[in-house]
UniProtKB/Swiss-Prot annotation:
Residues bearing glycans: N415, N541
Spans annotated as Disordered: 794-832, 893-923
Cross-referenced InterPro entries: Cadherin-like_dom, Cadherin-like_sf, Cadherin_C, Cadherin_CBD, Cadherin_CS, Cadherin_N, Protocadherin/Cadherin-CA
Membrane topology: Single-pass type I membrane protein
Gene name as annotated: PCDHGB5
Extracellular compartment residues: 31-687
Cytoplasmic side: 709-923
Protein name: Protocadherin gamma-B5
Gene Ontology terms describing biological process: cell adhesion; homophilic cell adhesion via plasma membrane adhesion molecules; nervous system development
Family matches, as PANTHER family: CADHERIN-87A, PROTOCADHERIN GAMMA-B3-RELATED
UniProt keyword terms in alphabetical order: Calcium, Cell adhesion, Cell membrane, Glycoprotein, Membrane, Repeat, Signal, Transmembrane, Transmembrane helix
PROSITE patterns cross-referenced by the UniProt entry: CADHERIN_1, CADHERIN_2
Amino acid sequence: MGSGAGELGRAERLPVLFLFLLSLFCPALCEQIRYRIPEEMPKGSVVGNLATDLGFSVQELPTRKLRVSSEKPYFTVSAESGELLVSSRLDREEICGKKPACALEFEAVAENPLNFYHVNVEIEDINDHTPKFTQNSFELQISESAQPGTRFILEVAEDADIGLNSLQKYKLSLNPSFSLIIKEKQDGSKYPELALEKTLDREQQSYHRLVLTALDGGHPPLSGTTELRIQVTDANDNPPVFNRDVYRVSLRENVPPGTTVLQVSATDQDEGINSEITYSFYRTGQIFSLNSKSGEITTQKKLDFEETKEYSMVVEGRDGGGLVAQCTVEINIQDENDNSPEVTFHSLLEMILENAVPGTLIALIKIHDQDSGENGEVNCQLQGEVPFKIISSSKNSYKLVTDGTLDREQTPEYNVTITATDRGKPPLSSSISVILHIRDVNDNAPVFHQASYLVSVPENNPPGASIAQVCASDLDLGLNGQVSYSIMASDLEPLALASYVSMSAQSGVVFAQRAFDYEQLRTFELTLQARDQGSPALSANVSLRVLVGDRNDNAPRVLYPALGPDGSALFDMVPRAAEPGYLVTKVVAVDADSGHNAWLSYHVLQASEPGLFSLGLRTGEVRTARALGDRDAARQRLLVAVRDGGQPPLSATATLHLVFADSLQEVLPDITDRPVPSDPQAELQFYLVVALALISVLFLLAVILAVALRLRRSSSPAAWSCFQPGLCVKSGPVVPPNYSQGTLPYSYNLCVAHTGKTEFNFLKCSEQLSSGQDILCGDSSGALFPLCNSSESTSHPELQAPPNTDWRFSQAQRPGTSGSQNGDDTGTWPNNQFDTEMLQAMILASASEAADGSSTLGGGAGTMGLSARYGPQFTLQHVPDYRQNVYIPGSNATLTNAAGKRDGKAPAGGNGNKKKSGKKEKK
């Protein structure tokens, strides 16, 4: 394979047949990629295109995530091109030392699917080291008696390179007395020896300087030098001689320090001091020590086979005359099973998807034992019962894969322990543990803690208050288990849902957006959803039923008698001869609440004459408790309170004005001075009534003038007979007999009352009529009628107000019993406001009914004009027919024509009230 991008550099090309057979017997080796590169390549240099050599396209690189798994980061893979690049310094001598072959082996890891490939990069040596001597100069003593041909061992140079780039030869500077001889050891290394060419004469030259040069075989060759200083000494004829040139011994690596390795021995044939031999290492050793007298070599430190398998030392023997002899000591270290196997994980997936299929690759396992032979052969096993297994991939390489289904909710993590045991005696083992976390997938939907929820909320709750909280749990983790809440549906209007309730998406709290009213909304149901944040998201629904509880938030409302603008009711008449237990009237009230909050009770708060009347606690009936006494006032006042049964109770009050009288005329003088409250909102109505009254007066004056002129032209005395006493022709209601009758011309005074309360005014006759015979002004109250304001009546003597039908009870203004009808059918009674558009029609209807006696005021005998549906459930037999006291000037035909002319409508008949009632029912 080539080293350039796109092809494998200098890889061994095996025959096709051999590759086929090799793939059958050893599939793991088929995935091994080989490269050959020189050492000391610059960082970023391209070794080869690993992606192309593995069969990956450029488009696959982002998903396959090709990378290098190695203990030391010598190489890296380009994410864009898939090229294998140099990432750190490649020093062959540092990586492999003196080994003849140097290769770096590592794994290339690819994902999706996860797999790994063996890569072998052979490092070639370059001539980057020069030969070096340990000393820049050294001294050598040679006796002048030394014979020509005597050899002296010189210092050896070192070259870290191997092969041709290593040390190849030595050279010596020219000197006629010396020559250089190069010898080779058994391991192929060369060392120099200095040979004496002729006898030295100390007296002529006692000191010689030579230069020794060491050269390697590179191109160009590199060299190193040292200075050789030779001192000529006096004669010492015999040098020491070792009994062996090379000493060899084997030593176990576990021997303790101080163990004797061997003993070297040398002899010298001289005598005296020249025969005394001193032993020393040619180079200072740190592992072994040498006894200078005995030549015994002992261990100084603990030996380690894995660090150095053999030692080679040079021992010198020097006699007293300075002659030196050398021998070589070679110590071979024998391996012991003293290293446990080492287990390391590569490309470990710490997070495993819980839906991973069996056989998914989890990690690569590397086993390394520094021992050799059987001591370095390792067996790997997986401890415990876990859903994983290990598969042997190649020598000392294994795969950790899944061997079953995973469920994070049951077991979120696994503690995987792998034990490696060698085959030594005794065997050594080591274990490594790793925690594998299971990554969650969204396989669990949220689950509510209850199948359904039911809450009760009292009405009038503050807006924004929490009314309920639902909770759902999800067994998943992270976003898969993060639950958010929402309102999916309800039985409320979709557009109005947001104005009623809202829900916190995080806490599941349901908030009320408004104050609930029990009288409007008593219950509603929501469909809530809990949804996780997984992809795809899972959800669950639950129903929440909200019951709105009633509170006593509605005070009783008095329907009958209705309250006036001043908060009091108009008066009722009681016969003077009423016996105890006589039903005077009935207070009718309703309460919009329910239950005890709507259970009404009636109480007398204040009475002008205590003990004269009694009030039914539950019925509200006002009855006479005793007969009217002489000292009792004719006018009585009762302040009635209506309370409900709530806690605390709410109440409403009504004031009853009761008048003891047998006829209406008896109480007229008392009520004439009754002040009429003003209503600022009726100013516009007042002006309309005044304008209408002026038009009516002008019309009536024209009619009267026409009648007077006609009578004056007539010669018949009978035409003036109506002005005689006791003879008066009347049209419409009958005037009471105590009215003055005569043939005098009529005189009219206009009673103008405030339009807000007295829209219907009656005319008052001339001064011949007594004060007790004053005509009443109409009131819309439906009970008795207050008199007109005297100041107003005198200020407009020329005006006459038209008749009004508002003094009659309408269908919606008649009171009913408590609880007899709903709130929609019970309007305020009486209604003091009138519709200006129907004013003329009401006047005509009133005039017609007054003329023919069909007014609803007398619709039933003794019922005060109340219908059977809405009237109080009692009769007032004692109340006189006060319609005979109401006098409306003008004939029915005249009023009808006038009304029709004004309105452009047909004349109104006596059934005008029925039409009005029918119109309301149609609404």
